[in-house]
Each structure stands twice: as structure tokens, then as C-alpha cells.
């Protein structure tokens, strides 16, 4: 009899607490995963299309001394992809934050709104600055990028980790803190932003015909 009462109490406690909703689950939802994969594919297709056929002269050309060349933008994207993925992994090493929903619940929409918007310009942090290294060719940058992106996409497609519960800070205090999912999402949104920059370079007066 005592055992039966104990079982009933356990069941009642479970019913009182209720099932874990999708909003409470720190893992990626199916919609979040599909959105991330779509952004990753879109950003890669855009970049490869923009770089297709770019000559060495076009790769190195600058509209002004203080403006980035296409090559510099592409190297910045390569550096940033590695950094942002590493930040996601760094976040996963931190203890799960019980207040992750409060601290990061609105940040995904903020990233989607702010990052592709080129009307607000920001200076790249020093660790992500591509200046001073013009040795990588277009082919080398693309090969390295494809390797990194394959890793990022495989992770996005297969991980079951509770990404949203693990937080850390990055190089832009405006967004801090972000959770691990948001750092991975940052990768393609940041690329979409700079794909626009590459298109702007190609549309600038004086851009070499070949």
C-alpha cells in the first residue's frame, strides 16, 4: 500500500510539472535547424557566385586605400567562420545557464535583423581583421572556406547538444551574451552581410573589367 501511494505521488508530481515545451528545451528546434541550414546554404551559394570568375587584379583592387578589396572581405569571412564556430564550442564548455531564455531569448531575431543590414557599419575587431596578409589566392581562400563550411554544416545538421543553454561573450558587446546556437547562426548572417559588401565593390566605378 505504501509503495502504491509513493507511485501515485511521483505521477502527480510529474503531471504538476508538466511536459517540457519546445520553448523550454535548450536544444535546437526543427524550425531552428532548418533555418540555420537554409542560411548556411544561401550564404555559401551567394559567396561562390560572387567570387566566380574574379581575376587576380579584381581580387586585389580597392576603391580607396581605407576600403577592403574583395580578397580582404573573403579572408575576413574565412577568419570569422573559424572564430564564430570556436565561440560556439567555447560556450558549450561553460555550465548551462538556467536563465538562458531571459538572457538570449530575443537575440536570434536581433541577429537576423541587424547583421544583414549594411546601413549600420562597424569596424572589424582586430582578431578578424584581414589586412596585412594578401598571400592567399582566391582558389586558396575558397578551398579553405569550403572545408570550414562543410564542418559547420555537418555540425548544424547533426548536433543534438543543448546549444541554447550555454552562453558566452564575443567581440561585439552590443550582442553579448549569445548562446552557442546564436554563434553558429551568426556565421551565415555575417556572410550575407559581407556578400553585399563584395557586390558593392564589384559595382563601384573603376572596378577592373578583368
Where do the language-model regions lie?
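N-terminal secretory signal peptides that target proteins for export/translocation
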Residues: 1-2
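Bacterial N-terminal signal peptides
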Residues: 5-16
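An N-terminal domain-start capping segment
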Residues: 17-26, 71-75
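Short, helix-capping/interhelical loops that line the mouth of catalytic, cofactor-
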Residues: 20-35, 86-145, 169-175, 205-210
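N-terminal secretory signal peptides
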Residues: 31-79
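Short amphipathic alpha-helical segments with heptad-repeat character
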Residues: 34-41, 74, 78, 139-146, ...
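Generic structural signal for well-ordered, non-membrane alpha-helices
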Residues: 42-52, 82-83, 119-123, 150, ...
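Short, contiguous alpha-helical
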Residues: 61-111, 150, 154-158, 162-210
